């Protein structure tokens, strides 16, 4: 088993190494968003701080810029922004994860007394359709992983006939390990909870949460964590229209396995943010990162874009810190502080636009951060429109609709590939000397 896995890893790594220099020359490569050295990536996996460094694993097809035969890519970072690529961590190699239309699906990572353990969904096909099971792999150095001889460690015994049973997210509470796994019943999304004393022998605990017709048909990539004195269940629902990442906030009783949620919300209001995963770092921060791309089943999708011809596809979002807004009871998401260390040249522009427009020239190939301070006290304008990347091929538009209290991003005429118009509400408070604006809480 170990020898076969090693051969598969070496083959995949050899191919990536043979094309990565060519891929690096692609004019579409990003400057400060994480990308694989080449080929296709999607969901973030195994997001963890281990022995002082941040580790990010990810769904990876090393052989093509299209989805297929999932491996786990791997990178590490000191600051969540600049990443160093490490050898591919997992490859399909065993009877439980060798499906050509599957492989080593999404999962998570935990530190078990210095041993880095990955838990992932293995997919195989027994001739009657795809079967999804949960498996583990271990490493003493955080780089080289061996699959557990007793895999799979969780079988789909509680999913009542369907074949969707994937994306384990593991954590420890007290003396027990817990894992949430996404599934569906009667075309309604749900998350199952299991517990274990050793990450190898698991018992079913409960249906942690489920849809009753209002929250989608399948819940992918669930994550369960504490923020403040509340617990959060985060997942990516299928079949919920333009809502592709959401959260439920409530209270957890581990003695009964019962999660009672009272609030729900979107993790992101844009088009390209899917399957986010969280970690808790040594500063006490809950940080998430998501896949910055879309699936063809999403209503705004039209094409993955020209980067596919350059032998790569996909990137991750900027990492965000998760906080609980005590006033609203909802979550707020803030770019991690580390991104400020990459600011180089500051260019302050004071604009007073009565009508028409004002051009702001940006250097560094569209790689910048732009902070706006808008004086709403003095303006009588009904809207403010910001045009990005305007050229002969199109334009992306950000519109602040002051009158209707909305922030709108429109990329329908941006590049000819992915489309979409997304908006979030603005909550504006004015009180003599103060103006406060909250965007989507």
What is the meaning of each model-derived region?
Residues 71-79, 133-142, 192-198, 245-255, ...:
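Beta-propeller blade signature
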Residues 32, 45, 73, 107, ...:
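Residue-level detector of beta-strand structural context in well-folded domains
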Residues 92-96, 178, 186-275, 279-282, ...:
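Accessory beta-strand-rich segments of carbohydrate-active enzymes
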Residues 15-20, 251-263, 267-274, 279-441:
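Beta-rich accessory regions
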Residues 43-63, 67, 87, 105-129, ...:
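Hydrophobic core segments of beta-strands in well-ordered, beta-rich domains
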Residues 2-45, 64-67, 82-111, 143-172, ...:
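Surface loop/turn signatures of beta-propeller and other carbohydrate-active proteins
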Residues 40, 67-70, 102, 129, ...:
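Active-site-proximal structural scaffolding
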Residues 37, 50-52, 57-61, 77, ...:
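Acidic/polar N-terminal loop/beta-strand segments that form early-domain functional surfaces
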């Amino acid at each position: 088993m170990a020898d076969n896995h090693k051969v598969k890893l070496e083959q995949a790594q050899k191919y990536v190494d043979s094309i990565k220099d060519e891929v690096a020359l692609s004019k579409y490569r990003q400057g400060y968003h994480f990308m694989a050295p080449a080929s296709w990536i999607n969901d973030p996996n195994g997001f963890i701080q281990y022995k002082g460094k941040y580790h990010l694993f990810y769904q990876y097809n090393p052989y093509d810029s299209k989805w297929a035969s999932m491996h786990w890519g791997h990178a590490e970072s000191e600051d969540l922004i600049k990443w160093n690529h490490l050898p591919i961590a997992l490859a399909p190699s065993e009877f439980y994860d060798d499906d050509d239309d599957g492989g080593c699906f999404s999962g998570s990572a935990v530190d078990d007394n210095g041993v880095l353990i990955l838990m992932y969904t293995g997919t195989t096909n027994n001739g009657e359709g795809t079967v999804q099971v949960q498996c583990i792999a271990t490493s003493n150095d955080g780089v080289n992983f061996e699959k557990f001889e007793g895999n799979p460690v969780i079988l789909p015994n509680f999913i009542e006939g369907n074949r969707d049973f994937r994306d384990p997210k593991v954590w420890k509470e007290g003396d027990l390990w817990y894992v949430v796994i996404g599934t569906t019943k009667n075309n309604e999304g749900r998350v199952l909870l299991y517990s274990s004393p050793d990450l190898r022998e698991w018992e079913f605990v409960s249906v942690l949460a489920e849809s009753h017709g209002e929250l989608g048909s399948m819940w992918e990539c669930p994550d369960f964590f504490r923020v403040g004195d509340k617990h959060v269940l985060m997942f990516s629902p299928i079949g919920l229209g333009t809502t592709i990442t959401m959260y439920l906030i409530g209270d957890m009783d581990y003695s009964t396995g019962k999660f009672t949620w009272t609030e729900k919300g979107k993790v992101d209001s844009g088009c390209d943010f899917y399957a986010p995963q969280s970690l808790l770092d040594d500063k006490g921060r809950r940080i998430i990162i998501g896949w910055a791309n879309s699936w063809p089943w999403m209503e705004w999708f039209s094409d993955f874009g020209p980067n596919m011809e350059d032998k790569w596809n996909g990137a991750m979002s900027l990492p965000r810190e998760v906080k609980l807004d005590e006033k609203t009871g909802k979550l707020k998401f803030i770019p991690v502080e580390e991104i400020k260390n990459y600011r180089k040249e500051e260019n302050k522009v004071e604009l007073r636009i009565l009508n028409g427009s004002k051009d702001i020239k940006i250097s560094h190939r569209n790689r910048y951060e732009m902070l706006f301070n808008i004086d709403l006290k003095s303006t009588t304008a009904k809207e403010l429109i910001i045009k990005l990347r305007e050229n002969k091929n199109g334009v992306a538009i950000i519109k602040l609709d002051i009158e209707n209290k909305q922030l709108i991003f429109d990329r329908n005429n941006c590049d000819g590939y992915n489309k979409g118009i997304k908006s979030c509400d603005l909550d504006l408070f004015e009180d003599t000397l103060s103006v406060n604006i909250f965007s989507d809480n």
